[in-house]
């Protein structure tokens, strides 16, 4: 089964998550981690912490190890991650990618912030006149600028590995793990 989870709930009830994983045979944990930076999580009004994100990853990593030791199919983490939010700085982006690299069997789904109308942050960006979007360009994986004030060249360089030393590992290798949800089900 595919389990859609919140990091704070995994961190709060690890024994329940462990039992549900074993009983329901969860093989994919879809977790909206969003960021490895507390500052960015707060900007998003995510109401979770970086520590809860790490605890969720660590628990699923333990479940992976257990399943492998027992000869069962190990679960994967399908992690939703967002970069390019208002106020994000390079170190915040590096922290998000470092967090993603902690996942033993992770499929990072990395997208750039899109200021969707109706969302609190999207409404604020639009009200501040920073949105470059029209409804025709509201896609999950944008290939063009969505917001004024974001250094999209930085993110392109980051994804190409030009900041690997600062991040501490090969970012293109992490990006190669990126996939779609259907891959987590096979």
Language model regions located:
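A structural motif corresponding to the C-terminal lobe/cap of the Radical SAM core domain
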Residues: 2-185
């Amino acid at each position: 089964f595919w389990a859609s989870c919140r990091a704070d709930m995994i961190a709060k009830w690890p024994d329940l998550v462990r039992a549900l994983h074993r009983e329901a045979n969860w093989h994919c944990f879809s977790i909206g981690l969003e960021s490895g930076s507390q500052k960015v999580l707060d900007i998003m009004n995510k109401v979770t912490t970086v520590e809860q994100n790490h605890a969720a990853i660590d628990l699923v990593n333990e479940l992976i190890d257990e399943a492998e030791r027992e000869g069962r199919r190990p679960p994967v983490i399908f992690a939703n991650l967002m970069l390019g939010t208002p106020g994000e700085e390079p170190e915040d982006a590096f922290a998000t990618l470092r967090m993603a690299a902690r996942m033993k069997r992770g499929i990072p789904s990395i997208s750039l912030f899109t200021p969707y109308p109706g969302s609190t942050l999207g409404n604020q960006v639009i009200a501040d006149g920073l949105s470059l979007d029209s409804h025709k360009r509201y896609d999950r994986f944008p290939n063009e600028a969505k917001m004024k004030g974001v250094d999209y060249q930085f993110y392109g360089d980051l994804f190409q590995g030009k900041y690997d030393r600062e991040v501490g590992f090969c970012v293109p290798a992490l990006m190669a793990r990126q996939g779609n949800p259907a891959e987590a089900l096979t």
